[in-house]
Structures are given as structure tokens and as C-alpha cells.
From Swiss-Prot:
Miscellaneous remark of the record: The recombinant LGox was digested to three fragments (alpha, beta and gamma) by proteinase K.
Entry's Gene Ontology molecular function annotations: L-glutamate oxidase activity; nucleotide binding
This protein's name: L-glutamate oxidase precursor
Entry's family note: Belongs to the flavin monoamine oxidase family. LGOX subfamily.
Origin superkingdom: Bacteria
Keyword terms, alphabetized: FAD, Flavoprotein, Nucleotide-binding, Oxidoreductase, Secreted, Signal, Zymogen
Length: 657
């Protein structure tokens, strides 16, 4: 650990930046108050902003994602004249999107099925979003990041526990009644890890990681450690900056040391990528870093900021409890939209933003703003009518919630400050792509007896056909291609299969690699990891009532891994995702494939322009503090202006601020 920086102007300025960033990250406000408690009071306890002595203002909110909707709701309830402009003509919610049946579209064969294109899990330590879900009466149930025992836990009839937040001030905020009978299901680890042609269950890897690790040519102590332990051990020296180990548990240092410790973490490590940190600071071998990247799904993000991965270690790990919204995450923005029907204007894309900045000597010629006029003018074009003339909107001030990656294509007059322009131009937005496949039966939950029973329902001998197929012990085996299968087994168990001729043609060129038969997965929720292009897969945590099937997140990939999928047509994605799913689960899963799926590339989304803001090295200290700084009457909010990138909680924190 390094000490306070030497006393010169450059290091003093950098140290002050790091202190400000630490206080923002920890939500430490003026007078060392906990801002999270203030946000919970505003958003949940009262649902209203504090009293204002300003005259009623006209406010434009740009973007009807979660930030724009909540900001609009609070401002409307406070008596302001609010208009929310959204480019998407068909929906609100931004990167909260659920594939589901509507009156215009049905993505899956079973109209009851749904799956998430975007946000899918809400961690226990994000109290703002969880309490908002409860306040809106949407309900919540557990999302199983690790598969569980189906007959364990307290069951759906027992109420979920209340949302609780313990502040660094010692105060505890809670929302709702205790649920003393609530019990989490037992974690099992039946899902798979497959890398370098070796496949084991997650529980077996945790107990004995050598088989998988040897495939990465690890030796010595590294070969005997699960990758999650390698990373956690590597991060212990960083945690020492702001916490101590007391009786085997991490405890924050006294307040001033805690805040300054985080500031030192930012100062010392913002210049690292995650790969650089593991190699140059933690001393992991290149082989160990490759294993970490593959099994923790971070290979494609090793070049990005250390800080993002460091914070994510708390966000996505097996020990955290997660929640989901029954019926889909779309219900959250939809519930907010219900109270803003008159304020939201869909189908209007902002192309020009003019604003009056009182700190400047004069306004540019030809603008419609000024000291005696409106503070902001926005020009939009209609998404559903390219021939329509642009429309002009005026207001006293604007709150811009769209991603900087989208704002980059808006003409802004006058030019904003240099640091703001840097933030808009340079903020790195990563890619994320999902490929979801629908199956008529929940084969991932099957035992081997279930497999026998269900396959024999299709036709006598189908179970034996798969069981006795050619095996590949060391060398790739070629099962009959889809075109050669006598029974046409792709989708064989599905009435009115949606498998298209295009899918069959693509599949006919892709023989299955590896054994045709795999052990029954018998996994309830959770997910598997692989080094094939699918990377991470997730099984549904809960059945859809009245449905025998489900939708599997067959591929969830980021960054360069996602870009490979983005080059394919949808039909190609479905067939490749199915083949790679079969590599882990055996060929026989094909009989339940309905031929229907859904896929989403956030990098190719014309409104999102990327999955989320994820900094590269140095970006946080270079311009993050300028990301949310107002430019005259123009304010900025969204997950990209928080330090909880890619999470709904971050979007809620900055809008409330």
C-alpha cells in the first residue's frame, strides 16, 4: 500500500479527484451524510422531492429509460411541467427489455413464455431498485445464479424478506415486514464447466479444480485453486486499503480511513486494466489469467478498467442473493409509465440541442434560446415518418438521460465544456449479445429416468438412438447431420415445429463435435460456462405457470465475444447456439427445440449504442466527475453518470441526486 502522495500541484489535484470519486462511489454527501439514505427517503418513503421555492418550471427529459421515467415521475409529483421525449416509437424502458408476447408480436411458440434481452437480476445490496419494485407492487422472487435443490427452501407461499440497507453511519433502513420463515434453497452446483475439452460439474470443480485447470497448463499452487479463489486472493491486498480482517470477516476501517482508503485504491489502480492488474500487480501467470478469463467470462474484458471488474466481484458472485420480477423486468418501466402517459412522447429522436449558458458572454446566432427566452430548445425527427418536418420542443431546463454513445450523434449548440465533450466522445461502451432458445420441455431439469421417459414418448427407440450413437473419446465424432437423421429429430417432440428450412440447411453443414450423449444436467436455475462461443448459459430459475417448456439463455457474451455473434443473421445465431449448447448437454436436447428464439445485440441497438458504459484504464479519473456536471440548464443522468455502470441501481442513484 502506498502513502499519501507527495506535495506538488499535480499530485494534489489528482488526490482531490480521487477523494471526490471515492465519496461519489460510497455515496458520502456533504457533512458526511449517507446519500443512499436520502435517496431511499425521496424515492421510497415519500415518493416526492423535497419542498422547492423555485417557480414552476418546464422541464424536458430526454430518454424514457428507467432514469428518465423515475425523474419524470418525481418532477411531475413535485408540480413541474414535464415532457419526456423517447426515440423508440414502440416502448419505454431503454435497456430493460423483455421478449414476450404482445398484440403485435409473439417471439416464442408458447405465448406464456418470456425472457430478458437486458437486465435480468437484481442483487440484494441494491436497495433502491428492490424497494421500488416492492413499492410498485410488482412482487419479486429469487433469481438463482447458482442452481438449487428443487425441494429445499421455504417455498413461494412464504413472503420474501424486506429490503434492508445498513448505512455506514450505523443506521438501518428497512421497508416491509420481517419474514422469519423465509429460507433460501440449497445451492447444488450441478451445472457445467467445460474448457479445453474437459467437462465437470461446478460443485466438482470447486472441490477439485485440477482437471479443468490442467487444461490451461497451470502448475504448482495455481493448478489446485479454483479461479474464483485466485482472483479473490489477488484482490485481498486492494481490500486492505479500506478494510481489515476481524474474526475472519472484512470490516470497514474507521470512516476517514475508509474513505481515504478507497481514494488510494482509485489513485493506485485506475490506470490498470484487469488483465494488467492480475499480471503485473498480483503476479498471476499468463495461463492463470487465461483460465480466469474463460471460467469467469472476463476474457473479452481483461483489457478494460480494473475498477469495473473489481466492483463486479461484489455484484455477480455465488454468495450474493439475487431477485427477479415475476413476468419479466419490463413490468418495472411499464408501471412507471402508467403514471406518465400524458408526459411521455414516443417516436421522437433528438437531433439538435440548443441551450443558453448564463456563464457565456453571448448565445450563438440563430438559436432560439437566450436570457429572455427559453433555456433549452430540442429538435426531434419522427421515427415512424421520415418525411415529417422536424419538431421543436422548448423548456427552462433539460435532463439528458440517453447514453453518451447516442448523444454523440446529436448536434449541440453551443459546444459544451472540453471535459464534457471528452466524456461524451471517449466513454467506452461495451458490447453484450444474448441468444435465447425456446424448448418445449425443461430438459435441463431432467434426471436420466426423465430423459428415457420423454424420449420414448416421441417414438420407441429414440432414447436408445441417442444412447448408442457414436462416441468420441479424444477425437471428434460425427453424428448424422440434421439432413441425414431418418426421423428428422430436430424439433421432433414439438407439435407445429418452427424449425425453418434455413435452420436445417445451416445445421446440415455443422456436425456435432464431441460425444452425442452427456449426463443429465438436473439443474434448477443457475448457469454453465464454456470456452466455446456461447461462453455463458443460464437456465430459467422458475417455471412459467401452465407451461411444460422454457427459454434458455443459450449464449450470453460480452465485448469481442459478443461482436462475433453480431456478424451473424438470427437463424445462424440460433443454430450455432443450439450446436454449442449440445456440446455441453448432448445432442438429444434438439428434439425439444421449438425452432423459436430471440436474440439481442445491444451494440447494434439504434437507441442504446452499446450495453453499458464500462471504462477503460484512466477514464474514471480523467473525466468521470465531468460526466454528470450540468452545462448551464442542461443536466445529465443515467447509469453512465454513476459508478455502478450497467446496473439499474446506478441509474436510480443519479436520477435521485
Amino acid at each position: 500500500m502506498t502513502e499519501t502522495p507527495r506535495d506538488n500541484s499535480a499530485t494534489r489535484a489528482r488526490w482531490q479527484t480521487c477523494l471526490k470519486l471515492a465519496r461519489e462511489l460510497l455515496l458520502v454527501g456533504p457533512d458526511d451524510k449517507d446519500l443512499k439514505l436520502s435517496y431511499l427517503h425521496t424515492l421510497i418513503d415519500t415518493g416526492r422531492l423535497g419542498p422547492t421555492h423555485h417557480p414552476r418550471k418546464k422541464i424536458l427529459v430526454i430518454g424514457a429509460g428507467i432514469t428518465g421515467l423515475v425523474a419524470g415521475r418525481l418532477l411531475k409529483d413535485a408540480g413541474y411541467d414535464v415532457t419526456i421525449i423517447e426515440a423508440n416509437e414502440s416502448r419505454v424502458g431503454g435497456r430493460i427489455k423483455t421478449f414476450r408476447a404482445t398484440k403485435h408480436h409473439q417471439p416464442f411458440d408458447d405465448a406464456a413464455q418470456y425472457a430478458e434481452a437486458g437486465a435480468m437480476r437484481l442483487p440484494d445490496f441494491h436497495p433502491l431498485v428492490l424497494a421500488l419494485v416492492d413499492k410498485l407492487g410488482l412482487g419479486r422472487r429469487q433469481f438463482y445464479n447458482v442452481d438449487v435443490g428443487p425441494s429445499t427452501g421455504s417455498g413461494p407461499e412464504v413472503p420474501v424478506p424486506p429490503v434492508t440497507y445498513t448505512s455506514f453511519t450505523g443506521q438501518t433502513w428497512t421497508n416491509g415486514d420481517d419474514s422469519p420463515d423465509f429460507r433460501e434453497p440449497d445451492k447444488r452446483g450441478n451445472s457445467w464447466i467445460r474448457a479445453n475439452r474437459v467437462q465437470v460439474r461446478r460443485a466438482d470443480y470447486t472441490a477439485s479444480p485440477e482437471r479443468i485447470n490442467e487444461g490451461f497448463h497451470l502448475t504448482g499452487d495455481e493448478v489446485r485453486a479454483p479461479v474464483v479463489k485466485m482472483v479473490d486472493d489477488a484482490l485481498e491486498s486492494v481490500r486492505d486499503y479500506y478494510s481489515d480482517v476481524v474474526d475472519g470477516k472484512r470490516v470497514n476501517k474507521p470512516f476517514d480511513e475508509w474513505v481515504e482508503g478507497w481514494a488510494r485504491v482509485i489513485r493506485d489502480f485506475d490506470g490498470y486494466s484487469m488483465g494488467g492488474f492480475l499480471r503485473d500487480h498480483a503476479g498471476l501467470s499468463d495461463e492463470a489469467i487465461e483460465a480466469v478469463g474463460t471460467l469467469e467470462n472476463t476474457s473479452s474484458r481483461l483489457h478494460l478498467s480494473f475498477f469495473h471488474s473489481f466492483l463486479s466481484r461484489s455484484d455477480i458472485n455465488p454468495t450474493v442473493r439475487y431477485w427477479e420480477i415475476p413476468g419479466g423486468s419490463w413490468r418495472l418501466p411499464h408501471a412507471l409509465h402508467e403514471g406518465l402517459r400524458d408526459e411521455v412522447r414516443l417516436g421522437h429522436r433528438m437531433i439538435r440541442l440548443e441551450y443558453h449558458d448564463p456563464s457565456r458572454d453571448a448565445d450563438p446566432e440563430g438559436t432560439a434560446v437566450g436570457p429572455d427566452g427559453w433555456g433549452v430548445t430540442v429538435e426531434t425527427v419522427a421515427e415512424n415518418d421520415p418525411q415529417a418536418p422536424p419538431r421543436r420542443w422548448t423548456a427552462d431546463l433539460a435532463i439528458v438521460t440517453i447514453p453518451f454513445s447516442a448523444l454523440r450523434f446529436v448536434e449541440i449548440v453551443p459546444s459544451m465544456s472540453y471535459k464534457k465533450r471528452r466524456a461524451i466522445v471517449e466513454t467506452h461502451y461495451d458490447s453484450a449479445t444474448k441468444v435465447l432458445l425456446e424448448f418445449s420441455h425443461r430438459w435441463w431439469e431432467f434426471t436420466e429416468d426423465d430423459w428415457r421417459e420423454e424420449l420414448e414418448r416421441i417414438a420407441p427407440g429414440v432414447y436408445e438412438y441417442y444412447r448408442l450413437g457414436p462416441e468420441a473419446a479424444g477425437e471428434p465424432a460425427r453424428m448424422p447431420t440434421l439432413a441425414e437423421a431418418d426421423a428428422g429429430l430436430l424439433g421432433a417432440a414439438v407439435k407445429d415445429s418452427g424449425v425453418t428450412e434455413e435452420m436445417r440447411q445451416i445445421g446440415s453443414t455443422m456436425p456435432l463435435r464431441g460425444p452425442a450423449l452427456r449426463p443429465a444436467t438436473h439443474s434448477f436455475g443457475g448457469g454453465s460456462a464454456t470456452d466455446n462461443p456461447n461462453r455463458f448459459m443460464y437456465y430459467p430459475s422458475h417455471r412459467v405457470e401452465g407451461s411444460t417448456g422454457g427459454v434458455v439463455l443459450a449464449s450470453y457474451s460480452w465485448s469481442d465475444d459478443a461482436a462475433r455473434w453480431d456478424s451473424m443473421r438470427s437463424a445462424e445465431r440460433y443454430v450455432y447456439a443450439l450446436r454449442n449448447l449440445q456440446a455441453l448437454h448432448g445432442r438429444r436436447i434438439e428434439v425439444f427445440f421449438t425452432g423459436r428464439g430471440a436474440t439481442k445485440s445491444w451494440a447494434r441497438d439504434p437507441y442504446a449504442f452499446g450495453e453499458a458504459a464500462i471504462y477503460t484504464a484512466h477514464q474514471m479519473t480523467s473525466f468521470h466527475l465531468d460526466a454528470s456536471r450540468p452545462e448551464g440548464p442542461v443536466h445529465f443522468a443515467g447509469e453512465h453518470t454513476s459508478l455502478k455502470h450497467a446496473w439499474i441501481e446506478g441509474a436510480l442513484e443519479v436520477h435521485t441526486a
